[in-house]
Structure formats: C-alpha cells, structure tokens
Amino acid sequence: MIKKSEKLVITFYTTTSAMAMEKICKECGADGRIIPVPGSISADCGLAWCAKNESEDALLALMVQHNITPQGIYHCLV
C-alpha cells in the first residue's frame, strides 16, 4: 500500500474547471495531477487537483491568471 502524505488539494465547482486546471498546468509544467476528491472533503465536482504543499502560491497565481475559481483549498493526507 502506498504511504499517504500531506498534499495540497484544490477542489472545483465544475468538472470543466478541473479539466481547465489540468490543461493549464500541463502546458505550464506546473506540479500536480487530477485525483478523485478525497472522502474527507465535500465538493460539487468529483475531481480535484493534488500537488505538493510547496506549489500552493504558484498554483493560486496560475488560477488567477487563467480565471479558474477554486471551491476549496485544503492540506490533507492523500
């Protein structure tokens, strides 16, 4: 079993926003990947962006630049 570690988890209101985040992050080489929303978090969309905690500032700036609105930003075991 893979050991869980604390990660940054960003949830979204819509699947479209989650997919836009994935596309932009891949284009920019930003850290992270799409995951199912962890059971400890409630969100409108079932997809979330998971990345290292250290990536938070860069990812938030990227979302502002591309008009992506997060539903929630969490630090949890994934």
Spans of model-derived segments:
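Short, flexible, solvent-exposed loop/turn segments with mixed acidic/basic and small polar residues
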Residues: M1-I2, I34-I41
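Short glycine-/aliphatic-rich beta-strand segments at the starts of folded cytosolic domains
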Residues: I2-T11
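Small/polar loops that bind or transfer phosphate-bearing groups
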Residues: I10-Y13, A51
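Short amphipathic alpha-helix segments
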Residues: Y13-D31
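Short Gly/Pro-enriched loop/turn and capping motifs at secondary-structure junctions
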Residues: T15-S17, G39-S40, E56
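A short linear hydrophobic-aromatic micro-motif
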Residues: D31-V37, Q71-G72
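Surface-exposed aromatic
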Residues: S42-L47
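C-terminal structural segments of small proteins and small subunits
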Residues: C50-V78
